[in-house]
């Protein structure tokens, strides 16, 4: 039923057998694969009852982002060991739907630092170990575009971090100075933001200085084999076919077209100033035009499983596909799934490049806004 529709899924890092999903009914459902029932083992109901749109896991802690309700959009932080109520709630970080959440990957140097993005165009770093919202916000940037995805980008060892100069201000008390000089708040590294208009921007998270903004991801068309992007399915710091360390702030994107085709593409800023962006195609996955078992419609989600070296994808055609990057492998069927199809990744015969499509929205199916 509509009231039970789920908006986001994620694994729980502290338990390889558990995963969670956020609901439009305003709760987080937690499942354990070892349980004999298909019912969730836990339901965490948010105090606002607002639909949850995004979720991220950090050990035993879970962060969830809500849809705008009235004038508030909230980030609830849950402790899975005491689930009666969130341990923290931040209601002023964003002023519109919170669409994307991700914790910093370095749990030692930057523990509990949460990156968030929303429809208000803001991209924020928040220290979720601090209860008081005014103290918890580390830095904020404005992309001037409604955001669909944010994340921590890859960067080389030579990356020029924002210099961390100890701050002393006569107007600050000891508490405030201790906060701004917190080592966990410095050298956070670069982040990426992808908008609903299919634009990419790169930022340094310490103060959200812009490295590169307003990059149209549908503009590059000189890929070989030929490929034209319609939308970004998802993004990550590094992809399964990365062959060399990043020379500048970079990230990988899973691109899609209207027919169900996909491509794994990386974008890298050539220097810290981000004047030049280098685009590289690492793989192209066919649609049903070239492979009968591939996707025939828009692809909504992707998940790379490093252990099995498989890429799982789901689309509007109702298919769940398991792809192998080893072209010699036989197709692999996802275990226990229903309505599934399989294929190995192959480079299809080159076909004439299609004319780039006009940007904008299809008013019938909103095909150019896959996150809507």
Q: PLM features: what roles do these ranges have?
A:
Residues 2-230:
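WD40 beta-propeller repeat blades
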Residues 145-372:
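Terminal intrinsically disordered, low-complexity extensions flanking WD-repeat/beta-propeller proteins
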